[in-house]
Each structure stands twice: as C-alpha cells, then as structure tokens.
Amino acid sequence: VWAPFYNEGLINKYEFPFQMIHTETDFFETNIDYDYLIDNPPYSSKEKVIRRCVELNKPFCLLLPIDTLERKYISSLFRDRDFTIIIPKKRWKFINNGDKITMPFKSCFFTIGFKLGRQIIFE
C-alpha cells in the first residue's frame, strides 16, 4: 500500500499486516510499484492528486472533503469507472499534536478500483 502523503504522521505508530510504502519523492513525478494507494492528501491540491491517481490506473482511496463531490472534474473522471464513495455518519476528528480537532467540513472516501461496486455508501 502506497501512502505518498503521510510523512511523519500518526500512521507511523501502527503496524499493518501488509507493507506500507512511503517515499520522500514528488508524488506527481514518481512511478513506483504498488498495489493500492490509500491516503489523506493535501486538500489544496486535491484535483491534481485525483487526476494523478486516475492516470496511474491502480486502485486508490482518498479521504477528501465531501464538497469535492460537487466539482465538475469528479463526474468526468469517475463517470465510466468502478467507483465507490464512502460517507461516514459523523464528522471525523483528526489528531494534531495530541489534540483532537473537529474539521469545519465533512469528509468522505473517494475510491476507484476496489471492486466494491459502483455506488455511494453511507456509513
């Protein structure tokens, strides 16, 4: 699993039953071998990140603000693909320097290629 944006975040404190890949390289110019991309990318470049993920043509899951669903590029990029949108029931709290922070917006998972079916899941 490639997590290109996690840097030195909280994810480092967990052990996974699969190999996590992180490189200190530019995501937009790096080509590495991986099976899945799962991450919480910088929201300031979300369109560029989504376009790059689609271009890489491998399964991905991105945690993004729910209002990303309203963007025109989403319908054009997702229209003919096996996508699933997973919407959590509650607004998530993120941990920053040990403090739980409620984000001012709701988030959801945008996925392509996980064979979950073409749907929006309210979870």
Residues covered by each model-derived region:
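Class I S-adenosyl-L-methionine-dependent methyltransferase catalytic core
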Residues: 1-123
